[in-house]
């Protein structure tokens, strides 16, 4: 139930370090970059809510570690709710990314499995990076030793980009696609659509295809029509 990178395949193209818009999270970016490429670097624990960029950094780290020649495993723990014990079988990789470790909270056997993995990785020199909604001290863990181990990592509470930063990112990414987003379009979009950067960039990809197919500029009427046809829940 873990994900390894098969030969010839790639991690998500957009979720690379160079596409991470750090804002106030420059120190976290630097720490994760170091962990992914330099053996012996401090382990990292990233916390933050939806849209904070923690999964982006995790995927970017996996990709960078793979490109540096390391064997990589990625565990999306929230997606493994019925298979938490897969954690116990994780072994043999040089870089392991554990996404949403808070999903294990309250699962006694899974907490012990993660505790054992932590200790094995430390003994074997494996690099670990963790993400969760909250800092280790705030997790509802039943195993105090696990909380202590996670708390020993270098911790970063990721801060979401401000609206002004999201607008600039969206304009810049649109320009790379040959799309002009004027302030009127951005005002309309930000008033009616999710402000999560990942969702906005996904929308931009779809707008790029739709505007090319229709041979039209992205205007408010075009955007309104596009969202209506897509049956967006945000419209």
Label for each model-derived stretch:
Residues 153-165:
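Conserved AAA+ ATPase "SRH/arginine-finger" region at the nucleotide-binding site
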Residues 153, 167-180:
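Conserved AAA+ ATPase "sensor/coupling" helix adjacent to the nucleotide-binding pocket
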Residues 1-34, 39, 212-235:
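A short, basic N-terminal segment
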């Amino acid at each position: 139930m873990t994900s390894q990178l098969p030969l010839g395949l790639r991690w998500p193209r957009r979720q690379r370090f160079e596409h991470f818009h750090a804002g106030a999270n420059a120190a976290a970016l630097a720490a994760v970059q170091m962990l992914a490429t330099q053996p012996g670097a401090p382990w990292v624990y990233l916390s933050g809510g939806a849209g904070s960029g923690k999964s982006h950094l995790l995927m970017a780290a996996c990709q960078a570690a793979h490109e540096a020649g390391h064997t990589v495993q990625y565990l999306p723990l929230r997606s493994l709710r019925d298979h938490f014990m897969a954690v116990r079988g994780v072994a043999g990789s040089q870089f392991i990314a554990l996404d949403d470790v808070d999903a294990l909270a309250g699962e006694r056997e899974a907490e012990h499995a993660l505790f054992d993995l932590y200790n094995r990785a430390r003994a074997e020199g494996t690099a670990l990076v963790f993400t969760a909604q909250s800092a280790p001290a705030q997790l509802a863990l039943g195993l105090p030793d696990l909380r202590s181990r996670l708390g020993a990592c270098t911790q970063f509470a990721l801060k979401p980009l401000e609206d002004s930063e999201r607008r600039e990112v969206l304009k810049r990414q649109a320009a790379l696609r040959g799309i002009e987003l004027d302030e009127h379009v951005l005002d309309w979009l930000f008033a009616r659509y999710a402000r999560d950067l990942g969702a906005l960039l996904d929308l931009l990809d779809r707008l790029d295809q739709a505007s090319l197919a229709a041979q039209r500029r992205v205007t408010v009427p075009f955007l309104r029509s596009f969202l209506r046809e897509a049956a967006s829940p945000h419209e």
